[in-house]
Amino acid sequence: ATGVALKRHKRSSYFLATKMSNMHAFTRGASTTMFNNSLKELQTTYIDYYLLHIIGGSDEEHEPMELFQARFIDNGILDFLLQKRKEGVIRNLGFSFHGDQKEFDHALSMHDAGKVHWDFVQIEMNYLDWSHAHEINEANVNASYLYGELQKRGIPAVIMEPLLGGRLANLPAPVVAKLKQRAPERSVASWAFRYCGSHKGVL
């Protein structure tokens, strides 16, 4: 449906983003089929932002590092995607991060070593997770660390969960009152979006 809707517009007038979400079927064949189907369904010859989805995740059989290896390295899919970027079929290649800090650090170490250049990284960031994500859930990593590591390398950040699943748009009444006192014309949600957008290097 997205491809049909966008067909009426010039391709240069918008950006497309999609992902390699091969969590359950990560053979080379299944993964390349997923990539090719994205091009077909979006009715395009190239994708502006392509992500390796859920780096840092795990499943019942694999620890995070093992799953990353199985989904993207052992099956040659990362090399396949790098070649697609070289051909111009992918304009920007990155990953979305969920979970284990060691996996995040490992992915950036590949960038540091010249094995892969990440054009962008998608991280969870909002004014609560900036300093308290790990405190709330030990499995999470504070956004200040994630963003800081990307900034050190000049890698742009794409933000997910700027409203923390909508919770930052539904604050307690005393907090809302203070925000409205400061800027009556702004919505509660706008404070969260402004927070993320005010950081350097956020796409």
Model-identified regions with their sequence ranges:
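Glycine-/small-residue-rich active-site loops that bind phosphorylated ligands and cofactors
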Residues: 23-26, 99
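A short, structured active-site edge motif that brings together acidic residues
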Residues: 12-24, 50-53, 123-125
